[in-house]
Amino acid sequence: MQIILLEKVANLGNLGEVVRVRDGYARNFLIPQKKARRATDAALKEFEARRAELEKVQAEKLAAAQALAERLNGFQLKISQKAGVDGRLFGSVTNADVAEGLRKAGFEAVEKSQVRMPNGQIKAVGEYLVQAVLHADVVADVVVLVEGEMA
């Protein structure tokens, strides 16, 4: 299916590009998320008329993400979990826990789908580096300090 991208999509293209994707990817993800439209003649004409407006919105989103990344880079988030004597956690720290901790710390815009944990879930006490993907071009590094509570 031919689609017009309404914003930058990772591994696919930039705003305004006409790309070919699988039908299911377009119908089930890109179009419902308002990241793309079908590439019909009418849609292309309408897009060209609204191009400047869409580019302005994209620039505002990018600027907001960069401002948040400046505040978030190097931020240390402390999370307490019940742990055993050997330092292993009862359970684990997930991206949802990190996102909730960031929300409580005042970073309301960070959602769990934006938190990337390179080594998977955290299962031991210690200091870990986690990434927050705020925009296709903006990534912030957050230090997560996992402290153990005696059970």
From Swiss-Prot:
<dbReference type="InterPro" id="IPR036791">
    <property type="entry name" value="Ribosomal_bL9_C_sf"/>
</dbReference>
<dbReference type="GO" id="GO:1990904">
    <property type="term" value="C:ribonucleoprotein complex"/>
</dbReference>
<dbReference type="InterPro" id="IPR036935">
    <property type="entry name" value="Ribosomal_bL9_N_sf"/>
</dbReference>
<dbReference type="InterPro" id="IPR020594">
    <property type="entry name" value="Ribosomal_bL9_bac/chp"/>
</dbReference>
<keyword id="KW-0689">Ribosomal protein</keyword>
<keyword id="KW-0687">Ribonucleoprotein</keyword>
<keyword id="KW-0699">rRNA-binding</keyword>
<dbReference type="GO" id="GO:0019843">
    <property type="term" value="F:rRNA binding"/>
</dbReference>
<keyword id="KW-0694">RNA-binding</keyword>
<dbReference type="GO" id="GO:0005840">
    <property type="term" value="C:ribosome"/>
</dbReference>
<dbReference type="GO" id="GO:0003735">
    <property type="term" value="F:structural constituent of ribosome"/>
</dbReference>
<dbReference type="GO" id="GO:0006412">
    <property type="term" value="P:translation"/>
</dbReference>
<comment type="similarity">
    <text>Belongs to the bacterial ribosomal protein bL9 family.</text>
</comment>
<dbReference type="InterPro" id="IPR009027">
    <property type="entry name" value="Ribosomal_bL9/RNase_H1_N"/>
</dbReference>
<dbReference type="Pfam" id="PF03948">
    <property type="entry name" value="Ribosomal_L9_C"/>
</dbReference>
<dbReference type="Pfam" id="PF01281">
    <property type="entry name" value="Ribosomal_L9_N"/>
</dbReference>
<dbReference type="InterPro" id="IPR000244">
    <property type="entry name" value="Ribosomal_bL9"/>
</dbReference>
<protein>
    <recommendedName>
        <fullName>Large ribosomal subunit protein bL9</fullName>
    </recommendedName>
</protein>
<comment type="function">
    <text>Binds to the 23S rRNA.</text>
</comment>
<dbReference type="InterPro" id="IPR020069">
    <property type="entry name" value="Ribosomal_bL9_C"/>
</dbReference>
<dbReference type="InterPro" id="IPR020070">
    <property type="entry name" value="Ribosomal_bL9_N"/>
</dbReference>
